[in-house]
């Protein structure tokens, strides 16, 4: 059995156990991860139970890739532009705090992701849905995701696959090459993931799977990012009453 077929069976079982009549709600960016996840959902549930949500923040220069995917899969989709709430929220916070912080760029980058997840859950609540998480193992390992943003969801079909392995799933599923090999980026900074990370997914994926890496400085950077971002993938710590 191909790996993609195993994931498809897992998705079927998840919905059987957690909402046999529910729809799958998925944010569509047009990148490899959301494309592969959406294709897996269609294979598992049928196209009528998969609902895509395109969420540009104003004008999105590569939104054609998102339209290409939903048309290729022939799924129902909605386009919700988050630019107005994004500007209203960030401007309100800026006006009230009035501080010059080095975290400003991070906050401006993370906010759209959290608004998108709020949008997905809003739609999910209205359409009897379960929200698909589209993060992969490579992103999760170094914390390259937004807490309570794209790292959220009800179920996660590809979170145990590296970026390299997600592309292999895309090949198995017969997705268009331009979607499988689209250069990953955050959609805000106009820089690729690899430019921002300072190393390639090829190097990261090999390190994750084998522990092998040639550049010790990059190894140190990856290890540091992994430890610093574990809180994003672990359950929230809670006080244990009476030590229980």
Predicted feature residues:
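N-terminal phosphate-binding loop and adjacent alpha-helix
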Residues: 61-65
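Conserved G/P- and acidic residue-centered "switch" motifs that form tight phosphate/ATP-binding loops
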Residues: 31
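Phosphate-binding Walker
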Residues: 35-36
